[in-house]
Amino acid sequence: MKSGKQSSQPEKGTSRILSLTVLFIAFCGFSFYLGGIFCSERDKIVAKDVTRTTTKAVASPKEPTATPIQIKSVSFPECGSEFQDYTPCTDPKRWKKYGVHRLSFLERHCPPVYEKNECLIPPPDGYKPPIRWPKSREQCWYRNVPYDWINKQKSNQHWLKKEGDKFHFPGGGTMFPRGVSHYVDLMQDLIPEMKDGTVRTAIDTGCGVASWGGDLLDRGILSLSLAPRDNHEAQVQFALERGIPAILGIISTQRLPFPSNAFDMAHCSRCLIPWTEFGGIYLLEIHRIVRPGGFWVLSGPPVNYNRRWRGWNTTMEDQKSDYNKLQSLLTSMCFKKYAQKDDIAVWQKLSDKSCYDKIAKNMEAYPPKCDDSIEPDSAWYTPLRPCVVAPTPKVKKSGLGSIPKWPERLHVAPERIGDVHGGSANSLKHDDGKWKNRVKHYKKVLPALGTDKIRNVMDMNTVYGGFSAALIEDPIWVMNVVSSYSANSLPVVFDRGLIGTYHDWCEAFSTYPRTYDLLHLDSLFTLESHRCEMKYILLEMDRILRPSGYVIIRESSYFMDAITTLAKGIRWSCRREETEYAVKSEKILVCQKKLWFSSNQTS
């Protein structure tokens, strides 16, 4: 009996082990099967996101018609007057929560969902519709940007001058006492590429009131002005009120929201950025976003130190040391001194890979070459890296001098389009043709488009910048926004000679209230509604839209009723229009924001 019971135990144990083994193998196989499905579907989603703008909007008879989503009517209250310049992700009231190291408190710090405001931001008392372009470049209404501090503190530098109910912009600046046009003339003498269409895109760090960027527009150069939110100067708000491209931002601990090799030129006119501190990490970010062959221009300390040091409250020895340190850092990053005259110095980012190969071979080199695990285009809440981003070997024609000159480059498929899933020269050509037809139709349903009533425009979810390209002859500029969650097509936008930024529409955009005349979106809610609540996107749109400004929403019919209901609660007046192909599955909603004043103010 004992021997029989003992002999039966191994048999049961073996059976149980075999059963578990079979189950485990089956589970693994099923997991691989599900993983294959997931990866396949994920690729389809990415492909759909890119190719949605490269195919005609023709309804498929096989697609089931979903019942449009419905929501209850809602009426959003007014925010208090203290919110009139509210920037949710760069809110001075939240600065004390964050560290002062490298001024990181000035970076984006967005409130959690439970702290988001669900109210409408009022304009300042006495707000008027902005002066139209191009007069707006020279003057704006004081009540629209009521900042006296900058007028008083910078009066001797002629940044701006208050006269009656207007601010006037005489084109002065810290480093251009003879006017910005004279300053840019000197710069063009040093950089002939600014005259022939070679240089098209630029970034101005620490932009003042954006007079440099404003002057470049007449020279065929599109500059994006960059400055942090502050309590006094409101540099970006002044720039956008003037109709000059600008965005809130600071080089601190995170990368700027642009891809690598984006700008043809970067500029700093006494922008007070400590370029040689922290191992030159700020210069490394400039190196990342400037394309090979592009330029970095510096005017102000320590340039021309032997003549200027007395006015800088320093010693000539200190400034000489700073200059030598700056030159050494730039050389170690594969910049070469290009030209210098008086207060302006120019360095050029090398295109020759031998410099980067030399860094890679020298194990003791500082800064080192970034390894392959660091994605050069990753730029949404991505920490700054203390290393040199070398040009990608497979991309050989993205450098300045290799890409076509402006305006030819707008319609030539850049080499980096091959990095976008489904991207090709044919897809870009098709996209351009499609957007020409769409914009032609938009101008029928919104006659103000193409006139001086609209200056600052945002394409909230572009792919190749086709909407912007179709408007290139009109008196507007376009901020092209590429979702941080979609395929990385922003390098293509920059290679075409346009400007833009990465962004996640679950968060607030990096700008002041009342800064855009037109917001355009194409299928944004279809693509993002699973992540972002619709009402918060629309409230953010209302925040950045100017009173009397317009919205063009091109969206699936499934969302149209809900969008219309929310828009009514935001005090927009809207009308529904057919698309250019009059398909049932897609509609256009054209809205206008009303000019209203807080009940606590007088109009």
UniProtKB/Swiss-Prot annotation:
Disulfide bonds: none
Ranges per topology, Cytoplasmic: 1-16
Record keyword Protein transport present: no
Glycan attachment sites: 313, 600
Residues in compartment: Lumenal: 38-603
GO biological process: methylation
Keyword Phosphoprotein set for record: no
Protein's UniProt name: Probable methyltransferase PMT20
